[in-house]
Amino acid sequence: MARHKTSDIMLPAAWRIPWDRQLDQHMARVIKAMAQINFASNMHHNLFMFTTREGLLHRNRMLSSSTTQELQSTQPIAVRQQPRAARACGFGDRDRRVIDPPPIVQLRIDGPGLSEEERRAYLRYPNYVMNCSIWDESGTRDASYMPDEYNHQRRLMGSLVGTPFVGDDDQNQEGCFFCFSDLSCRTPGAFRLKFTLIMIDPARASILRHFPTLTEIKTDIFQVYSAKEFPGMVASSSLAKKLKEQGCIISIKKGNERARPRGADGRSDDEDD
């Protein structure tokens, strides 16, 4: 069976990021899995597959250096759902509470130089990966690691890497979303989250240790409280509910009992649906 050559993609130096600083062990596991199974689709909804000869040739054209440079300038990301509060979880997993509401980041493809076919292909490209890190409230200092006395433990816990979910938002507009519903912070304070979008080429993941950073964004400031001061969880947004209905893995909350009375059935209103 004939082999089809793929073009050699030269990534601009500005896109290359140090593996050990930007990609943590969660990212490594994601990339390894991608390389092993050669991702053909998104977890639930990716409909764009590059398994035929024509598809592979099309992908190679799209991932050429010049095209990727254009793509970089046309891929803004927006935080559709900002984190507001969290309860500090300390150094154990027994009573870990997630950042609320869960951040949702949307990738938008609006380049004037892209055809509709290219726009839809980029929107459904299955191998985007988004990495999350925690920064101080000014957004200028990486706060991922605790002070020396804590043996360099990470401040942010949970699933720090997100994969794309393509679906309709609460206005029935199609989009590509990254949902981070399993993030917790160990210590009280004011912080921001930083999201970095990276494009992976599974066919080259075993030989490349650097992949293009397309864009990044920081959230608004959110507050992490002690258990005593934590104001409680808020009800899930219409956006979160809409994505959940379509198969996105995201927790749905009814709201916290401090904000609304406990129901007659005795359940706390902040339990998952």
UniProtKB/Swiss-Prot annotation:
Signal peptide: none annotated. Residues 70-253 form the Velvet domain. It is found in: Nucleus. A motif (Nuclear localization signal) lies at residues 211-218. GO terms for biological process: sporulation resulting in formation of a cellular spore. Residues 66-86, 254-273 are annotated as: Disordered. Keywords: Nucleus, Sporulation, Transcription, Transcription regulation. Residues 254-267 have a biased composition (Basic and acidic residues). One of its GO terms (cellular component) is nucleus. It comes from the Eukaryota. Coiled coil: none annotated. Its main location: nucleus. Residues 66-75 have a biased composition (Low complexity). It holds the Pfam family Velvet. Induction: Expression is positively regulated by wetA and brlA. Disruption phenotype: Decreases expression of wetA and affects expression of abaA and brlA. Leads to loss of conidiation capacities and defects in conidial tolerance to high osmolarity or UV-B irradiation but no change in conidial sensitivity to H(2)O(2) or the fungicide carbendazim. PROSITE patterns: VELVET. Component of the velB-vosA heterodimeric complex that plays a dual role in activating genes associated with spore maturation and repressing certain development-associated genes. The complex binds DNA through the DNA-binding domain of vosA that recognizes an 11-nucleotide consensus sequence 5'-CTGGCCGCGGC-3' consisting of two motifs in the promoters of key developmental regulatory genes. Positively regulates the expression of wetA and represses abaA and brlA. Acts as a crucial regulator of both conidiation capacity and conidial quality. The N-terminal velvet domain contains a NF-kappa-B-like fold and is involved in DNA-binding. Forms a heterodimeric complex with velB; the formation of the velB-vosA complex is light-dependent. Belongs to the velvet family. VosA subfamily. This is Spore development regulator vosA. It comes from Beauveria bassiana (strain ARSEF 2860). The lineage of its organism: Eukaryota, Fungi, Dikarya, Ascomycota, Pezizomycotina.
